[in-house]
Amino acid sequence: MAKEEIKIIAQNKKAYHDYFIEETYEAGIVLSGTEVKSIRMGKVNLKDSFARVENNEVYLYNMHISPYEKGNIFNKDPLRTRKLLLNRHEINKLIGYVTRKGYTLIPTKLYLKRGLVKVELAVARGKKLYDKREDIARRDAKSELEKHFKEKQLGI
């Protein structure tokens, strides 16, 4: 069987910096035709976007999809609210997470899978400033250690 081809269109790198990612879900997204064309061209921004559960449905807010140049009257508002498509049991799990204090839903990736636009939705918990500093210090120490071993291996 052929390997599933996934083409990542946009990533929310800031989410990994600002949040602890607990769990991720794959969700479909309701889009218009011109929005899909714009997404395929890579004109999308996930930076300040987030999701909420309302009336047992999940909606994505602040995801900016630039208007398609040739779409004229068919273009929608770039920041409009978009519905996410998830199974009922997944939505119930998300409701359980979000009702806990400090948890939120953040889109981390937007990608094409078998020709369909999908969103990777993460259940996330906000990081405090000292957590961010800790991560930066850990990353710096790791890169310094790798650099040291590489120099030792090469005999420099």
Swiss-Prot record:
- One Pfam assignment: SmpB
Q: Which SUPFAM superfamilies match?
A: Small protein B (SmpB)
Entry annotated with the keyword Cytoplasm: yes
**One term under GO cellular component:** cytosol
Region forming the signal peptide: none
Compartments reported by the entry: Cytoplasm
Could you provide one GO biological process annotation from this protein's UniProt record?
trans-translation
Q: Which GO terms describe its molecular function?
A: RNA binding
Keywords carried by this UniProt record: Cytoplasm, RNA-binding
Q: Which residues form a coiled coil?
A: none
Q: What does this protein do?
A: Required for rescue of stalled ribosomes mediated by trans-translation. Binds to transfer-messenger RNA (tmRNA), required for stable association of tmRNA with ribosomes. tmRNA and SmpB together mimic tRNA shape, replacing the anticodon stem-loop with SmpB. tmRNA is encoded by the ssrA gene; the 2 termini fold to resemble tRNA(Ala) and it encodes a 'tag peptide', a short internal open reading frame. During trans-translation Ala-aminoacylated tmRNA acts like a tRNA, entering the A-site of stalled ribosomes, displacing the stalled mRNA.
The similarity comment for this entry is: Belongs to the SmpB family.
Q: What is this protein called?
A: SsrA-binding protein
**Name of the encoding gene:** smpB
